[in-house]
């Protein structure tokens, strides 16, 4: 059984609307999601002793989510990740997007899907959010109807994304939750054991745009096919952290993507997805200045993201899996976050 409760989370400034919070609860998980950015604000998971802790980074109040912050828990779009120089050409026409990450456009632009109010609909086992992204929003062509559905099933949180376009446009939707399986507010993720089911990754240039090469993980820091303890692994390979797309094996059906185990608590997160890639990000840009839930500071490497996605900058790299959605087609992807103890 899943219970769904609805409450006011806060009011937007200047009478711009009321943000609601939806609490989904099963016998194993409790998830809070708000209608601002379809944002996961809390996710309580039991450890091997049966004690529940909140394992996602975020804020207690709406104000936290309205300030400049690194997409904690939000759905990002119209195109997640980076588009080089914020431009792409479609049917001979060049489109210019908002530049908001060095020379590039990141996560949909200045006012992406994470910074808008969505319309909620309560389901028996979850909540569905919808919105219409108008033609030209953040520079993207065509109107885009979008639905994001969160449902609970025991220890599994399922996120389904659907979209329909009035004209051809790139679409790439993901959730940007930062996890710490020791509990949010824990100082780092070095004691997490990580596995990612990928034989290849995308090397990036100095502004984190893929170079176009699809590189084998063999013999590199990116070989996470067997479990590695993150802290030791980063030290051993002298890397500052990960912020890279891993190219997932398998077909467009549900595929295993990643597993993270925190030995101290016993908590395990397994991720499955229909998407062709996952951005593994280790919170390299967190610096402890934002005050999170219960006053927690979030320093570098205090959370990790597994952003299931199409490959970054695919709209400019024709040999990457396609990201264009045409009128009459439906974008439809699902990601499963499965929690357990071991």
Swiss-Prot record:
GO terms for cellular component: cytoplasm. Pathway: Carbohydrate metabolism; hexose metabolism; Carbohydrate metabolism; galactose metabolism. The active site is at residues 176, 307. Its main location: cytoplasm. It comes from the Eukaryota. Beta-D-galactose binds at residues 81-82, 107, 176-178, 243, 279, 307. The keyword Amino-acid biosynthesis does not apply. GO terms for molecular function: aldose 1-epimerase activity; carbohydrate binding. It catalyses: alpha-D-galactose = beta-D-galactose; alpha-D-glucose = beta-D-glucose. GO terms for biological process: galactose catabolic process via UDP-galactose, Leloir pathway; glucose metabolic process. Its EC number is 5.1.3.3. Keywords: Carbohydrate metabolism, Cytoplasm, Isomerase, Phosphoprotein. It is an enzyme of class 5 (isomerase). Gene3D superfamilies: 2.70.98.10. The keyword Cytoplasm applies. The modification Phosphoserine is found at residue 124. InterPro entries: Ald1_epimerase_CS, Aldose_1-epimerase, Aldose_1/G6P_1-epimerase, Gal_mutarotase_sf_dom, Galactose_mutarotase-like, GH-type_carb-bd. Mutarotase that catalyzes the interconversion of beta-D-galactose and alpha-D-galactose during galactose metabolism. Beta-D-galactose is metabolized in the liver into glucose 1-phosphate, the primary metabolic fuel, by the action of four enzymes that constitute the Leloir pathway: GALM, GALK1 (galactokinase), GALT (galactose-1-phosphate uridylyltransferase) and GALE (UDP-galactose-4'-epimerase). Involved in the maintenance of the equilibrium between the beta- and alpha-anomers of galactose, therefore ensuring a sufficient supply of the alpha-anomer for GALK1. Monomer. This is Galactose mutarotase.
């Amino acid at each position: 059984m899943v219970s769904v409760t609805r409450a006011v989370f806060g009011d937007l400034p200047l009478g711009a609307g009321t943000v609601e919070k939806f609490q989904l609860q099963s016998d194993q998980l409790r998830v809070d999601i708000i209608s601002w950015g379809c944002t996961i604000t809390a996710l309580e998971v039991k450890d091997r002793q049966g004690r529940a802790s909140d394992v996602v980074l975020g804020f207690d109040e709406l104000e936290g989510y309205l300030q400049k912050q690194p997409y904690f828990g939000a759905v990002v779009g119209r195109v997640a990740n980076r588009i080089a120089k914020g431009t792409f050409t479609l049917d001979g026409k060049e489109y210019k997007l908002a530049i908001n990450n060095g020379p590039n456009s990141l996560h949909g632009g200045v006012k992406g899907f994470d910074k808008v109010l969505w319309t909620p609909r309560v389901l028996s086992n979850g909540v569905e959010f919808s919105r219409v992204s108008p033609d030209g929003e953040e520079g993207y062509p065509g109107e885009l109807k979008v639905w994001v559905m969160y449902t609970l099933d025991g220890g599994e949180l399922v996120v389904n994304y659907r979209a329909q376009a009035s004209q051809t446009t790139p679409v790439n939707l993901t959730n940007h939750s930062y996890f710490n399986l020791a509990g949010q507010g824990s100082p780092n993720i070095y004691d997490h054991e990580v596995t990612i089911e990928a034989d290849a990754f995308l090397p990036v240039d100095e502004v984190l745009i893929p170079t176009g090469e699809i590189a084998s993980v063999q013999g590199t820091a990116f070989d996470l096919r067997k479990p590695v303890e993150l802290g030791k692994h980063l030290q051993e390979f002298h890397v500052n952290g990960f912020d890279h797309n891993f190219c997932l094996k398998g077909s467009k059906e549900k595929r295993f993507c990643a597993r993270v185990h925190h030995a101290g608590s016993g908590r395990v997160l397994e991720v499955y997805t229909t998407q062709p890639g996952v951005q593994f990000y280790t919170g390299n840009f967190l610096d402890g200045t934002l005050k999170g839930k219960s006053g927690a500071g979030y320093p570098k490497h205090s959370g990790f993201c597994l952003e299931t996605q199409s490959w970054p900058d695919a709209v400019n790299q024709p040999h990457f899996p396609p990201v264009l959605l045409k009128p009459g087609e439906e974008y439809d992807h699902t990601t499963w976050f499965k929690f357990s103890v071991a």
